[in-house]
Design a protein with these regions (language model features):
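His-Asp-centered acyl/peptidyl-transfer active-site segments
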Residues: 7-118, 150-154
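Extended, hydrophobic beta-loop-alpha segments that form or line the acyl/peptidyl-thioester binding
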Residues: 12-19, 51-53, 72, 121-171
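Short amphipathic alpha-helical segments
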Residues: 1, 5, 55, 59, ...
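A short hydrophobic/aromatic micro-motif that marks alpha-helical segments and, especially, helix-coil
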Residues: 4-5, 84, 169-170
Length: 171
């Protein structure tokens, strides 16, 4: 969010399409119907706001939007189009984010100490301008997985994003 503000001349009003956990229980998988998997997360944060205050502001916004994960996805798209007057098949948000706070561990005594590692392979057809997935590793680190449209962005853009994110996080 801070990086998007930086590259947009200090814009305080930033919206990121924040992914909500997918259907995770057997009942949710077999219930039918539709459920939104993402929701716009809009925050207006001034440059004078300290890092922790901004983080809590974003967390509070996320907690409010997660309550609405049972909305119809088509309804949300229509509402966004009405509010921001976006053309058909476009989006107000240029960045999509999934944050997975827990490392994946297989709880199976038959596997003993065999470690599991999942690696994502994109098919090269990025449907969003930029989509970032952040997940934890078993050793306490983090994985950053970037998917982006090469017609609009280059690998150097992702390197800059990563560089500034690390400066922001570890400043």
């Amino acid at each position: 969010r801070t990086y998007l503000s930086k590259v947009n001349n200090g814009q305080e009003d930033i919206t990121i399409q924040n992914f909500i956990s997918r259907r995770s229980t057997h009942e949710e998988w077999t219930s039918g119907g539709s459920r939104t998997i993402m929701f716009p997360c809009r925050t207006v944060i001034s440059p004078e706001t300290d890092f922790l205050s901004a983080a809590y502001e974003i967390q509070n916004m996320q907690n409010r939007i997660y309550m609405h994960s049972n909305y119809d996805p088509a309804f949300i798209v229509d509402e966004m189009r009405k509010r921001y007057h976006t053309p058909e098949h476009t989006s107000y948000e240029s960045c999509y984010l999934t944050y997975q706070p827990m490392p994946v561990k297989v709880e199976n005594e038959m596997l003993g100490t065999i470690r599991q590692h999942a690696k994502w392979f994109a098919n090269g057809a990025a449907t969003k301008k930029m989509y970032l997935t952040v997940s934890h590793t078993e050793d306490g680190g983090m994985n950053f997985s970037y998917h982006y449209q090469t017609a609009h962005l280059e690998e150097h853009d992702m390197e800059l994003l990563y560089y500034y994110m690390m400066r922001i996080l570890f400043k």
